């Protein structure tokens, strides 16, 4: 079984200004790493799952979804340069994101 982690799935320069943009940029990272074929589908599925809530605490958010957009389970990691990506209004902005895709 291949690892769900890869250095190709890590970025320290996420420029997103909101959660939709953050998820989209991370989905594009997954596709660029060869772990998926459809960034749009990944984004759609993660946003649909986000409607039920995304875990977030102390500046770390964990958007996740089951999606047909990936060819193998993957975890993408990103650090936001804007530090203003909000998944949970009560928790404030997230600076670090772990996007789990299966």
Regions found by a protein language model. Give the residues of each.
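Cytosolic covalent-transfer regions centered on His/Cys nucleophiles
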Residues: 1-102
